[in-house]
Amino acid sequence: RKALEGKVNDLPEDQICDMLLASAYHPTFKLEKLGGKFYTDGGFVDTLPLHALVTNGYKDIIAVRIPGIGHNRRFRMPDDVNITYIATNADLGGVLNFDAEQSRRDIAIGYLDAKRVLYGLYGKHYYIERSMTDREALNMLLDSLETGENLRQFCERDLPRVARHLDAEGDYYELLIAVLEDAAAKQGVDNMRIYKDTELVSRLEESRE
């Protein structure tokens, strides 16, 4: 058994359809020989086939990571190759789930995940457009300080504790985003759209009233 990396332009025209079928053959289904050979989905050998693109001279690549089992082929990446990765934190359903509604949802998630990367949106499970400075984010976090609570203790003990709990790295703005996401998830706020940070804050405040 070996991996086959082929180019459409190098294939005889009467083999193109067979090779497209071969690239999507899933071993849980009954396999049929194509051209006298058995093939299986290339994702079982390399879930992110960057090697084929790099060896064919592509320098700027947008790679989409999809969660699941599989192997990533390791090879030396040339210094002049730029790769932008798009990944998701959402549950996309099973590989063999052919439900139309799930497929439409996955497509929508894909667009949102791409926008997160390409437009610099914030959030892990929500898609948030930034409008606040780091100082404004800190002030908003300080607004949650209860009357009489020690300010230094809040900044040096409580906020770092929250950051660790929410796995929030970076500055105060990123900590605020993690807090907002946590609150939004608990309140069942829809995450299938883009929010401006101030809009999400207002949405959460309205939900508490």
Model-derived segments and spans:
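Patatin-like phospholipase
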Residues: 1-209
